[in-house]
């Protein structure tokens, strides 16, 4: 397994629409395993393949406190959604930034697991929010796209400052 490089906003590759996985092969399973390793190393709760410059419809999630409830969603489809829940979201691709985003409170999804078996999942709360957030990545969308242009611009400026500080620290 390997820790992959996470793309950061405003990298345009984050805007790429992911393509469906046609067959769950050992290579796809390796990508899933690398994505989990990356997500845990970055202390995230979810990761879409788009975020690591792999433009296939693959998501990994683990919202458990003990980091022992892995969820793999390959080719996820949102079947149902209702209610509204607002939560302050963050993102590994938008470091150190958080914002309130409103999403469906209850969802039902269909996807393939790591072995290529189809399943359906009805969920709510943090897991429902996380699934929707990661599915957005597969469509080239970021949580900051739900914000006003002014708030997005402020986040962009903060990130540019952060990236400059990080670059100076490395040199």
Curated annotation (Swiss-Prot):
Enzyme kind, highest EC tier: hydrolase
EC number, UniProt record: 3.5.1.88
Keywords noted in UniProt: Hydrolase, Iron, Metal-binding, Protein biosynthesis
Keyword match Cytoplasm: no
A matching Pfam family: Pep_deformylase
A GO BP annotation: co-translational protein modification
Active site: 134
Comment on bound cofactor: Binds 1 Fe(2+) ion.
UniProt: Fe cation binding residues: 91, 133, 137
Catalytic reaction annotation: N-terminal N-formyl-L-methionyl-[peptide] + H2O = N-terminal L-methionyl-[peptide] + formate
Molecular function GO terms recorded: metal ion binding; peptide deformylase activity
InterPro entries: Peptide_deformylase (IPR023635), Peptide_deformylase_sf (IPR036821)
Cofactor: Fe(2+)
Keyword NADP: no
Record family assignment: Belongs to the polypeptide deformylase family.
PANTHER family to which the protein is assigned, alphabetical: PEPTIDE DEFORMYLASE
Protein task: Removes the formyl group from the N-terminal Met of newly synthesized proteins. Requires at least a dipeptide for an efficient rate of reaction. N-terminal L-methionine is a prerequisite for activity but the enzyme has broad specificity at other positions.
Protein name per the record: Peptide deformylase
């Amino acid at each position: 397994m390997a820790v992959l490089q996470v793309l950061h906003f405003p990298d345009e590759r984050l805007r790429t629409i992911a393509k469906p996985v046609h067959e769950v092969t050992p290579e796809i399973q390796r990508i899933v395993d690398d994505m989990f390793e990356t997500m845990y190393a970055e202390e995230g709760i979810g990761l879409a393949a788009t975020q690591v410059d792999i433009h296939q419809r693959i998501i990994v999630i683990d919202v458990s406190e003990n980091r022992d409830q892995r969820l793999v969603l390959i080719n996820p489809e949102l079947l149902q959604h209702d209610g509204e829940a607002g939560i302050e979201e963050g993102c590994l691709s938008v470091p150190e930034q958080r914002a309130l985003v409103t999403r469906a409170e209850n969802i039902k999804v269909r996807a393939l697991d790591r072995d290529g078996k189809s399943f359906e999942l009805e969920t709510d709360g943090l897991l429902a929010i996380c699934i929707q957030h990661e599915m957005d990545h597969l469509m080239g969308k970021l949580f900051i796209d739900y914000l006003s242009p002014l708030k997005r611009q402020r986040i962009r400026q903060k990130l540019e400052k952060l990236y400059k500080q990080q670059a100076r620290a490395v040199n």
